[in-house]
From Swiss-Prot:
<dbReference type="InterPro" id="IPR047641">
    <property type="entry name" value="ABC_transpr_MalK/UgpC-like"/>
</dbReference>
<comment type="similarity">
    <text>Belongs to the ABC transporter superfamily. sn-glycerol-3-phosphate importer (TC 3.A.1.1.3) family.</text>
</comment>
<dbReference type="InterPro" id="IPR012340">
    <property type="entry name" value="NA-bd_OB-fold"/>
</dbReference>
<comment type="subunit">
    <text>The complex is composed of two ATP-binding proteins (UgpC), two transmembrane proteins (UgpA and UgpE) and a solute-binding protein (UgpB).</text>
</comment>
<dbReference type="GO" id="GO:0015430">
    <property type="term" value="F:ABC-type glycerol-3-phosphate transporter activity"/>
</dbReference>
<keyword id="KW-0997">Cell inner membrane</keyword>
<comment type="function">
    <text>Part of the ABC transporter complex UgpBAEC involved in sn-glycerol-3-phosphate (G3P) import. Responsible for energy coupling to the transport system.</text>
</comment>
<dbReference type="GO" id="GO:0055052">
    <property type="term" value="C:ATP-binding cassette (ABC) transporter complex, substrate-binding subunit-containing"/>
</dbReference>
<keyword id="KW-0547">Nucleotide-binding</keyword>
<dbReference type="InterPro" id="IPR003593">
    <property type="entry name" value="AAA+_ATPase"/>
</dbReference>
<dbReference type="InterPro" id="IPR008995">
    <property type="entry name" value="Mo/tungstate-bd_C_term_dom"/>
</dbReference>
<dbReference type="InterPro" id="IPR017871">
    <property type="entry name" value="ABC_transporter-like_CS"/>
</dbReference>
<dbReference type="InterPro" id="IPR027417">
    <property type="entry name" value="P-loop_NTPase"/>
</dbReference>
<dbReference type="Pfam" id="PF00005">
    <property type="entry name" value="ABC_tran"/>
</dbReference>
<dbReference type="InterPro" id="IPR015855">
    <property type="entry name" value="ABC_transpr_MalK-like"/>
</dbReference>
<protein>
    <recommendedName>
        <fullName>sn-glycerol-3-phosphate import ATP-binding protein UgpC</fullName>
        <ecNumber>7.6.2.10</ecNumber>
    </recommendedName>
</protein>
<dbReference type="InterPro" id="IPR013611">
    <property type="entry name" value="Transp-assoc_OB_typ2"/>
</dbReference>
Amino acid sequence: MARILLNDVRKSYAGNQVIHGITMEIADGEFVVIVGPSGCGKSTLLRMVAGLEAISAGTVEIGGKVVNDLEPRQRDIAMVFQNYALYPHMSVRENMAYGLKIAKLPKTEIEARVAKAATMLELEPYLDRKPRALSGGQRQRVAMGRALVREPAALLLDEPLSNLDAKLRVQMRLQIKEMHLRTGQTTLYVTHDQVEAMTLADRLIVMNKGVAEQIATPLEVYERPASEFVAGFIGSPAMNIFTVDAADGRVTLPGGAVLPLPVPRGGDLRLGLRPEHLRTAQPGEAAIPVVLRSVERLGADAFGYGMIEGSEVPMVLRLPGTSQLSRGDRVEAVPDPAHLHFFDPVSGRRIEG
């Protein structure tokens, strides 16, 4: 296990910069998830740490040693990819042991490491099976076991669950979390799935167009998003974000309604409200008028999708699962003043109150 340090890491292709100066420290034993939409640079950043992509500027340190010029095999890391890449003619045991045999470790050491990883990943019943006799989730566990038996300084995972169905992803998330708790392995994990990111990470790197928009704990990212991009990306349904005109402790909403709110400054602002931080207004209470277009019922909860009255600005509300509201109904929603998010309309950065 080891600390990973990124110091102003940059990547360019033909003069076009795709990774823009990322600096962070991943502590020994920490589980950090890089999350963002397709094309944001998350896999490129992981591959730079692994040595599969050259670093254009800045440095990467693993275990206190700058590794910019080292080959992947010299960095003491192990990787797990989206595709399992198991040898089809080898058993689970042989797949997990193969790298150790190439490294010429003693047979007893190889057997001990494979047995330890198989126990941790609940693979003992499958050690003599070929990959074709395994489910997708079992194959992915074999790929992880093959990485773990090497006992690397750091474990890097690139979208390891994206080929699995929804039920298997939930199961594998739990197993990955339990595996990390047992091993204390320094882990860098890439995903586009915010649920994976929020449930697995000690800290998140939220990326957008090669920029680390925010590096923080999942709770901090959710409760205090550093930018409008982060606010809209993390959370499901996404945060409602729209432009308001602020002045003298009130905001004028799209459609013309006026709402008293504590504002950080006057002028145009971008206001963010999560669906769960809106409640139905009491009679005579100033509120956001919303006309529903549809209601999505999920059992315990329901979500109402509509528009702010008098505008084309979309709005999502969380409703009780027993709600009888339907298309065309008008709802007056009041935001929780403790959960207001304001963003600069030009830079998109968070404005503190």
